[in-house]
């Protein structure tokens, strides 16, 4: 049991280190877009983008804490969406449908953003029609369910399974597998990610976590 516990601590440390990495591609592309806006005298949008980038990194760092409030996690997701909507010239819309009673509960930071990133890069990027991303948050008994839904190109069942099993080695951020691993390590096998997708219809990612009151996060 001691060896098993040490392995869990080691894996948690590895996942924290991955989480702390700044995605250089995303940062470069965002700064490039801000520079272009400034050159076009579009200072209003440039200021909004800089503000979103600052908030994104402030929440990402969050004093080195692993857990943040769901409210902050959603602000992190929204900051990412603001940046990408400018970069993608409004090729997609996004909306939040959130049960406000869950906002004060705690969750692992940077849980939602990797799935939004996946939706944009793999689901919406090559679409002809306007893309749509919905983030839905609900209570479900003793748990909280976060849904990231898109109307993108979709995937086969095999591709869904591959995403959940494949480690990310291209330094473009936290992989879906890492998020799933993290949730299972912290909370057990009943928690984590499920992906449902249909080609040319879209993808729905469901993230299941326990309800954690502020102060209880130290128990994990």
Stretches found by the model and what they are:
Residues 1-196, 202-208:
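Two-component histidine phosphotransfer core
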Residues 191-194, 215-220:
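Compact Cys/His-rich metal-coordination microdomains
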């Amino acid at each position: 049991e001691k060896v098993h516990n040490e392995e869990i601590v080691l894996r948690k440390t590895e996942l924290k280190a991955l989480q702390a990495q700044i995605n250089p591609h995303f940062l470069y592309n965002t700064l490039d877009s801000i520079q272009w806006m400034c050159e076009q005298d579009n200072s209003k949008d440039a200021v909004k983008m800089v503000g979103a980038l600052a908030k994104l990194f402030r929440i990402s760092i969050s004093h080195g804490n692993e857990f943040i409030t769901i409210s902050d996690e959603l602000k992190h997701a929204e900051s990412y969406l603001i940046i990408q909507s400018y970069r993608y010239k409004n090729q997609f819309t996004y909306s939040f449908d959130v049960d406000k009673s869950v906002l004060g509960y705690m969750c692992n930071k940077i849980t939602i953003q990797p799935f939004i990133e996946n939706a944009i890069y793999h689901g919406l990027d090559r679409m002809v029609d306007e893309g749509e991303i919905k983030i839905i948050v609900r209570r479900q008994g003793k748990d909280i369910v976060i849904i990231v839904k898109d109307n993108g190109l979709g995937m086969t069942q095999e591709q869904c399974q591959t995403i959940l099993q494949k480690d990310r080695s291209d330094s473009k951020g936290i992989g879906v597998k890492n998020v799933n691993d993290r949730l299972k390590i912290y909370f057990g096998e009943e928690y984590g990610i499920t992906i449902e997708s249909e080609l040319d219809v879209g993808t729905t990612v469901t993230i299941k976590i326990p309800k954690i009151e502020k102060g209880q996060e130290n128990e994990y």
